Amino acid sequence: MQEILKAGDIFKTYGTVDVLKGIDFSVQQGEVVSIVGASGAGKSTLLHILGSLDRPDTGWVKIKDEEISAMNDKTLSAFRNQHIGFIFQFHNLLPEFTAVENVLLPAMIGKRNLKEAENRAKDLLRFLGLDHRFTHYPNQLSGGEQQRVAVARSLINDPLIVFADEPSGNLDTHNAEELHQLFFDLRKTYNQTFVIVTHNEKLADLSDRKVVMQDGVII
């Protein structure tokens, strides 16, 4: 398998608190990797640095041989839009937009061909079981459906890698298990790569690899 992400010697301090203490991390294309550990272990901070939402104090991050940690803000923003997807605990769908329109937003920001993007948005929503929800607004969707729209949005630009931070944290057991299965369906169909921070042991155990963090280090 091809290495899609590699990071080395990642340190991060907030004030006087050392949050990350020399992290080395790598992911292969098509892998589903979970990051687990107690609250305060540094999981979300690491995810945000790997996904370019934050910068390390020292160390480096490469995605497909591009050193994103060395990019300026403008270059990094364009790279993030084109190659990185994100899913968070809260779906952050815009209430005034339909499901399809919400999915399209990253493609519109990236100035992609709108017709092609709309076709992909509908294909993704169909794959995620939402073909009957194209024109529904977020307040007309269940919690599980809202999060599936957020998953489709993360995939609209065909990213190299998707980072998910507690993606099922707000869902009941049934919807959480359905969402977890979708990650593996997406990997099987699209060879999609996922790095997932989770407290859900079932999801962590399903993953190809479980990375355990404690006090800012991988153990």
From Swiss-Prot:
GO cellular component: plasma membrane
Protein's UniProt keywords contain Cytoplasm: no
Keyword Transcription regulation: no
Cross-referenced PROSITE patterns: ABC_TRANSPORTER_1 (PS00211), ABC_TRANSPORTER_2 (PS50893), LOLD (PS51244)
Start and end residues of each ABC transporter domain: 5-219
CDD domains documented for this protein: ABC_MJ0796_LolCDE_FtsE
Cited Pfam families: ABC_tran (PF00005)
Binding positions (ATP): 37-44
Subcellular location: Cell inner membrane
EC numbers: 7.6.2.-
Chief localization: membrane
InterPro entries: AAA+_ATPase, ABC_transporter-like_ATP-bd, ABC_transporter-like_CS, MacB-like_ATP-bd, P-loop_NTPase
Entry's family note: Belongs to the ABC transporter superfamily. Lipoprotein translocase (TC 3.A.1.125) family.
Subunit structure: The complex is composed of two ATP-binding proteins (LolD) and two transmembrane proteins (LolC and LolE).
Functional note: Part of the ABC transporter complex LolCDE involved in the translocation of mature outer membrane-directed lipoproteins, from the inner membrane to the periplasmic chaperone, LolA. Responsible for the formation of the LolA-lipoprotein complex in an ATP-dependent manner.
Protein name per its UniProtKB record: Lipoprotein-releasing system ATP-binding protein LolD
Gene for this chain: lolD
